[in-house]
Regions:
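Membrane-interface alpha helices of multi-pass inner-membrane proteins
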Residues: 261-288
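Membrane-interface helix-loop-helix junctions at transmembrane boundaries of multi-pass membrane enzymes
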Residues: 297-307, 402-429
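Interfacial juxtamembrane loops and adjacent helix segments
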Residues: 75-185, 487
Length: 515
């Protein structure tokens, strides 16, 4: 009976091994296809969303549309304008000269969703007469007043043209081909979607591991909805930030990552910072990629050489120099002067350190931000936004606990351990900086907490948190498995040891078959 059982085991063992080999080959094939699959799903969902999302039904879309129109007409930097809109209804408005066709298009498609749109009588009030463009006393423009009208867009004026490169290409094609505003609007969304999908393809392809979890994150509806195609600075910023996270992990986790990959990382990082200046601190993480990776791999590992230092240093210098210059060029106005005037914002800023214990001092700001986080305060007190924001902060809290446990159990090398702590700290700091910016520029002096918070501010940084979670959980599972195996081995009897040694011979059959 025992001999028959042994014979049955001997027959079944090779078939089990071969099935495992086939499964491993299928998984490797799927892993290779993962970038293309993720990009295909994003394109499919993106085109469906473009078809079903009405024009103008995206946050701040009209402000971004006006901003792009102003850049096309020569107003690369915003300037004071006398005109008003639904959101910017008072003084202190800045903007540029926007083509009449785009203004009329926004009026025709205004559905009450985005208050950045101009009023219905805008062209009658500001588009008549023969004055030159830039009717404000301090404004100048290269555009012709017969073709465009000064339009306010404070909340988009802080964005650099880099954030709108895909849409600028669409607007240029539309102008050259004399397309209607409606056709150009859709063209801009399509080009943005293609760029976004390309970035996500490159992001997944750059990963040495965790392609499936990252692909699932990238195709999740919250990330694709709106900001995979929207006419918005946030679309480009989100695409570049997610790509940067994957390239950064690739440079840290792959011992063979060379100068080319490091240069790609810093190039994407500089463009990311130019698209949204609050992401610029992420460039500092590039210095961690300079730490040599000690490995027993047969391939020679990149060392700390002058070219590698120069690549990272140049990226940081360019990124932070652009940040300083752009903030100086755009620091003379506020994003919503009808809610918080420039004078009120400057007073708040000056009191941060002048009166740190006051209501508008440093500790007052910290208390307001803490209150907003604990209560999940959201823009317009949206219950859905509040629940999502609270959930996201809860996820970050759980990730912190997991990271602490993983560090305590030493599942990382010292190099990767420092990296994950710094990466999560910088990413969380960027979210907190966004809270501070909203407290300064969007929250009235008599308000409690922080107004204007939206869960979309978390999404571009989700790639860093996802990869950290994968590394922590995998490391803890390996450590638990190793501990369990060690415990089992220490209690094995001589008979069990003999059986175990026989069973360990089975994989050699698979190796022979694979060879």
């Amino acid at each position: 009976m025992s001999d028959a059982s042994d014979a049955s085991d001997a027959v079944s063992a090779p078939s089990t091994v071969f099935s495992r080999v086939a499964a491993s080959a299928a998984w490797k094939r799927l892993n290779r296809l993962m970038p293309a699959l993720a990009a295909a799903v994003i394109l499919l969902m993106g085109f469906v969303l473009i078809a079903v999302t009405p024009a103008g039904h995206i946050p701040d879309v009209w402000a971004h549309t006006y901003r792009i129109g102003g850049i096309v007409n020569g107003d690369v930097l915003a300037r004071p304008v006398d005109s008003t809109s639904i959101l910017h209804s008072g003084s202190g408005n800045v903007g540029g000269c926007v083509s009449r066709g785009w203004i009329q298009f926004s009026i025709d498609h205004y559905d009450g969703y985005d208050p950045a749109a101009v009023n219905a009588d805008f062209l009658e009030r500001y588009g008549m007469g023969s004055t030159t463009a830039g009717s404000g006393t301090n404004s100048t423009s290269t555009a012709n007043t017969n073709a465009c009208v000064d339009t306010p867009y404070n909340n988009a004026a802080v964005n650099s043209p880099v954030a709108y490169l895909p849409q600028l290409a669409a607007f240029a094609i539309g102008a050259a081909s004399t397309l209607t505003s409606g056709t150009t609007y859709v063209l801009a969304e399509v080009i943005m979607l293609l760029v976004y999908a390309g970035c996500m393809f490159a992001a997944v392809a750059a990963l040495p591991r965790w392609r499936l979890p990252m692909a699932l994150l990238l195709v999740s509806p919250p990330l694709i909805f709106r900001y995979s195609f929207a006419i918005s600075a946030d679309s480009m910023a989100q695409a570049l930030c997610l790509l940067f996270a994957c390239l950064l992990f690739s440079c840290m986790a792959d011992p063979r990552a060379g100068n080319g990959r490091l240069a790609a990382l810093m190039t994407v990082g500089v463009l990311m910072g130019m698209s949204k200046f609050t992401f610029t601190p992420l460039l500092l993480l590039g210095f961690l990629a300079l730490i040599p990776c000690h490995s027993a791999a047969r391939h020679p590992l990149p060392r700390l050489t002058a070219p590698r230092i120069a690549i990272v240093a140049a990226g940081n210098i360019i990124g932070f120099a652009f940040l300083a210059a752009w903030m100086k060029l755009t620091g003379w106005f506020t994003t919503t002067p009808s809610i918080v005037s420039y004078e009120a914002m400057t007073a708040k800023k000056s009191q941060l350190f002048a009166d740190p214990f006051g209501a508008h001092g440093l500790f007052g700001a910290i208390a307001s931000i803490a209150r907003a986080i604990i209560t999940g305060q959201s823009n317009l007190d949206s219950r859905m936004q509040t629940l999502v924001i609270l959930s996201l902060w809860a996820v970050l809290a759980v990730l912190l606990i997991v990271l602490i446990v993983a560090t305590a159990k030493r599942v990382f090398s010292a190099r990767m351990g420092w990296f994950w702590w710094y990466a999560c700290a910088v990413a969380t700091g960027i979210i907190l900086l966004t809270y501070l910016a909203l407290w300064l520029q969007y929250t009235p002096a008599d308000a409690t907490g922080v107004d204007g918070v939206q869960f979309r501010y978390f999404l571009p940084l989700s790639g860093i948190f996802m990869l950290c979670a994968c590394e922590c959980v995998a490391g803890l599972r390996r450590r638990a498995s190793h501990a369990s195996h060690t415990s089992h081995t220490s209690h094995t009897t001589p008979r069990d040891s003999s059986t175990a040694s026989e069973s360990t011979a089975v994989p050699s059959v698979a190796d022979a078959a694979r060879a």
